[in-house]
Every structure is written in structure tokens, then in C-alpha cells.
């Protein structure tokens, strides 16, 4: 698998991807995160997008459909598409730290998701810290 640099005009292509996500029937909200969201892409950057979907029976099929269309729109296969419905708490926390909202059909539902995700993450991080301390001190 070889890495391909993002198109030089990636910033000009993003609005069309945003429109696609805003109009996709399953997408409730979406974030751009990572180096592009920070406005600091590097030569090794990819496009990091996180989506939350509703009314989906097959998450994998929906992800592949959306990913395929985003590849066409953004003219690259260097896209990391994350389904927030099924991903882990540390990755959700990473998305929440550095993101740009690019689709938001149901702001109240998004707010509830963000609040619950952050509370769960902080509860998890406290438990994780305790477990690591025990492991470190007890070998």
C-alpha cells in the first residue's frame, strides 16, 4: 500500500464534501478533524472525517458507500472515515479535541452525543489511570 499526497486543491474540494454529508440521508452530523481541521496539513496528512449516522442497518455498507463518494469528491483515497456510532472512546475524544463541524442536521442530538461521550471518556480515563498505577506499582 503506497501513500499518495493529498491534492493541492484539497481545501477547495472540501465544501463539496460538506454538502454531500449535509444531504446524505443517514448522516446526522459530521466533523473534519486532524491536521486539516487545524489548518496545518503536512505532506503526510490524510483527510480525517468522523460521522454519526441514524437509521442504518449495515454500518459497514454505509461506511463504504460514503467513503467511496468522498474519494470521488476529494480526488484522493487518503481518507480516514470514522463512524462515531461504533468507534472507541479515546478516538472520539481525539475527534472532540480538534474538530471542525461540517454537517449538523440535528444540533440537539449532536450536543447530547458530545456530552455523553466526554463524560464517558473522563470516567474511562480515571479508571484507566487507576489500572495503570496498579499495574506499575504491582508489576
Predicted regions located by residue number:
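Catalytic core of pol beta-like nucleotidyltransferases
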Residues: 1-29, 37-39, 43, 54-139
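Short, aliphatic-rich beta-strand segments
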Residues: 47-51
Amino acid at each position: 500500500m503506497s501513500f499518495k499526497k493529498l491534492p493541492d486543491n484539497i481545501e477547495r474540494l472540501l465544501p463539496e464534501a460538506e454538502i454531500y454529508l449535509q444531504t446524505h440521508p443517514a448522516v446526522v452530523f459530521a466533523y473534519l478533524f486532524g491536521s486539516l481541521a487545524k489548518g496545518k496539513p503536512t505532506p503526510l496528512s490524510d483527510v480525517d472525517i468522523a460521522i454519526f449516522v441514524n437509521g442504518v442497518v449495515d454500518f459497514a455498507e454505509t461506511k463504504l458507500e460514503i467513503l467511496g463518494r468522498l474519494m470521488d469528491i476529494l480526488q484522493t483515497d487518503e481518507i480516514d472515515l470514522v463512524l462515531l456510532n461504533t468507534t472507541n472512546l479515546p478516538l472520539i475524544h481525539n475527534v472532540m479535541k480538534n474538530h471542525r463541524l461540517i454537517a449538523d442536521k440535528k444540533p440537539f442530538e449532536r450536543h447530547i452525543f458530545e456530552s455523553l461521550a466526554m463524560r464517558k471518556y473522563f470516567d474511562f480515563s480515571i479508571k484507566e489511570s487507576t489500572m495503570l498505577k496498579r499495574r506499575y506499582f504491582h508489576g
